UniProtKB/Swiss-Prot annotation:
This is Bacteriocin licheniocin 50.2. It is found in: Secreted. It comes from Bacillus licheniformis. Its main location: secreted. Keywords: Antibiotic, Antimicrobial, Bacteriocin, Secreted. One of its GO terms (cellular component) is extracellular region. Thermostable. Retains 100% activity after incubaction at 100 degrees Celsius for 30 minutes. Retains 70% activity after incubation at 121 degrees Celsius at high pressure for 30 minutes. Antibacterial activity is lost upon treatment with pronase E and partially with trypsin but not when treated with lysozyme or proteinase K. It comes from the Bacteria. Stable from pH 2 to 12.
Amino acid sequence: WEEYNIIXQLGNKGQ
């Protein structure tokens, strides 16, 4: 899903 993709990217930036 596109939404899930964004969440994943945000999580990566958080780390």
